[in-house]
Amino acid sequence: MQLNSTEISDLIKQRIEQFEVVSESRNEGTIVAVSDGIIRIHGLADVMQGEMIELPGSRFAIALNLERDSVGAVVMGPYADLAEGVKVKTTGRILEVPVGRGLLGRVVNTLGEPIDGKGAIDNDGFSPVEVIAPGVIERKSVDQPVQTGYKAVDAMIPIGRGQRELIIGDRQTGKTAMAIDAIINQRDSGIKCVYVAVGQKASTIANVVRKLEEHGALANTIVVVATASEAAALQYLAPYSGCAMGEYFRDRGEDALIVYDDLSKQAVAYRQISLLLKRPPGREAYPGDVFYLHSRLLERASRVNEEYVEKFTKGAVTGQTGSLTALPIIETQAGDVSAFVPTNVISITDGQIFLETDLFNSGLRPAVNPGISVSRVGGAAQTKIIKKLSGGIRTALAQYRELAAFSQFASDLDDATRAQLEHGVRVTELMKQKQYAPMSVAAQAVSIFAAEKGYLKGVELNKVGDFEAALLSYMNSEHAALIKLINETGDYNADIEAELKAGLDKFVATQTW
């Protein structure tokens, strides 16, 4: 075999040109203390706040306390086998979760890993869990509605796309039920949904997932789960993970709805982490930055303008706005809305829906207290027909509450007062609604029209529900074109009013209920 020196030299030159020296410099440290899911690490000189630290066994911790001679980190997962002297490494990365359409219809944990047994997720990339919220210039005012399907909410406390509307109340007052119904109502609206369950029982979450599947809403929803048995770090980070998944749709010119169920448990998990990290406690033993914990999360829910979407998608999507609407849930103790976390979240959000135990126990469900519930920006987003018709509903209920309290002391009431009481009690009865039965815009409009125009006057109180059901069935069969028009346009004019009136007059004259 003859060796050609020219060929050999060319080959050597080629190899030298292609040769790459790759050196990976990663800081290494040693665990010096482990307790309650918190590890203290010595020797990590080059670590960022919030950086992922690699532990043995494909686990990670997140650096939260950067001190002079050590780093305090919280372990994301089991920590029983970690001991003093174990070596750990920095990664140079902050926590990221998978995002994309492949997550729709799936149940994932805080890290975006599937826990529903349906195989791997086909994601469109990764997104950091902590992102700075869009600035003032990048936002657009809220002017499109999110229909929850609840008469009491859509008529009196309307929610717009990009709004943050708090659902607040004691335990067992229907907070989760309201949020789940809002998700079910988005089945055909094009709004993608994210449901974040923090610190709940696994059986409760399984029931929610089953209900979403039964009503055809799971295919449109991402469920992010951090159960009560999981590490405090995972419960604290779950809302941020869910938010990153929702922002994927917002930033691409679509609309998304996210439910945080609930932020009280997230605050408790964060308090636990902070106390274990020896951070100084403040009011109710919460750390000083618990307001920032929720404000930086809820500020990410917004409606962004066309320029933002166009810039983000590099021109792939033009002329479309995107939105992320948030429904945070807060659980109060014995109706105390002046506690630390409830007042914080009330001040951050654009309104709140108060659910009361007394109303719930009296059979008024949803147990919304219209007197202290408010939507600060949703009025601009309300559909035209509901806005026109619902003006008198809130007034009627407010007057009824006032007069009902007064009438307990007054024996003889004049006719006008008695009429107001009669009207108020019927409107209150009309606001009742079954769970998992969200109503369309047209159905709500017909019911409210009947109340506003005095058609409930001669109806017995215990027959109001039957009257409404029979009326909606009649209108759907006899005035299907009108119902379709209202659902599609949400418009209200003299022609629509005349047809609604004619339909109701004929129904009252000819039908029984």
Curated annotation (Swiss-Prot):
One of its GO terms (cellular component) is proton-transporting ATP synthase complex. Its EC number is 7.1.2.2. The keyword Transmembrane does not apply. It is a peripheral membrane protein. GO terms for molecular function: ADP binding; ATP binding; proton-transporting ATP synthase activity, rotational mechanism. ATP binds at G169, D170, R171, Q172, T173, G174, K175, T176. Its main location: membrane. The record marks S373 as: Required for activity. Transmembrane segments: none annotated. Keywords: ATP synthesis, ATP-binding, Cell inner membrane, Cell membrane, CF(1), Hydrogen ion transport, Ion transport, Membrane, Nucleotide-binding, Translocase, Transport. InterPro entries: ATP_synth_asu-like_sf, ATP_synth_asu_C, ATP_synth_asu_C_sf, ATP_synth_F1_a_nt-bd_dom, ATP_synth_F1_asu, ATPase_a/bsu_AS, ATPase_F1/V1/A1_a/bsu_N, ATPase_F1/V1/A1_a/bsu_N_sf. It is found in: Cell inner membrane. Belongs to the ATPase alpha/beta chains family. Produces ATP from ADP in the presence of a proton gradient across the membrane. The alpha chain is a regulatory subunit. F-type ATPases have 2 components, CF(1) - the catalytic core - and CF(0) - the membrane proton channel. CF(1) has five subunits: alpha(3), beta(3), gamma(1), delta(1), epsilon(1). CF(0) has three main subunits: a(1), b(2) and c(9-12). The alpha and beta chains form an alternating ring which encloses part of the gamma chain. CF(1) is attached to CF(0) by a central stalk formed by the gamma and epsilon chains, while a peripheral stalk is formed by the delta and b chains. This is ATP synthase subunit alpha. The lineage of its organism: Bacteria, Pseudomonadati, Pseudomonadota, Gammaproteobacteria, Alteromonadales. The gene is atpA.
